[in-house]
């Protein structure tokens, strides 16, 4: 089912779209007065974006607290200023990491909650301004770490030659997979950035429930066809 009602729409956000791009597009297409989302998904990521429509926006304060699931590809050996492939390369190393090293550290993160510092290139507000705006302006600022948790994970693949880890993660709200990539590499004295990211689930909503952005008008006007 693509939605619990006309108040909630689940979108498969395309890569290169910001979450706000999706919000504004949907608002225009269906002529809604109010549209909001239940958790920012980075432009370089795709997947589940939960939208509240009109009265549905009142549900977002609860939905944003939901745990989320991702499939990520992490590239070791190179760091970027944004912690993902969209950023500028900051540093690199020739040191190769092994699957044994990676597995051990992922298990360590899994065992306990840990304090994670969000990326400076993020949509978090710092004194009323979005952090990524300040970061682009090279303003010096700090983001307080937050307590996060990995509930479940699966190492899906590790390509030693390309130094790419593919991993699925089921995590608490506020968890930044970009920061996890950097934290993971740091623990094994290496560098890394997030290569790709798909949000596969947000609370009860899975990617199989999502519709494409091009389907929004048809969905809104023919909802029974999608239920």
Swiss-Prot record:
A UniProt-annotated Pfam family: TruB_N
GO MF annotations, alphabetized: RNA binding; tRNA pseudouridine(55) synthase activity
Residue runs in coiled coils: none
Catalysed reactions, as listed in the record: uridine(55) in tRNA = pseudouridine(55) in tRNA
Keyword field: Isomerase, tRNA processing
E.C. designation(s): 5.4.99.25
Keyword tRNA processing: yes
Function: Responsible for synthesis of pseudouridine from uracil-55 in the psi GC loop of transfer RNAs.
Similarity comment: Belongs to the pseudouridine synthase TruB family. Type 1 subfamily.
Protein name: tRNA pseudouridine synthase B
Classification lineage: Bacteria, Bacillati, Mycoplasmatota, Mycoplasmoidales, Mycoplasmoidaceae
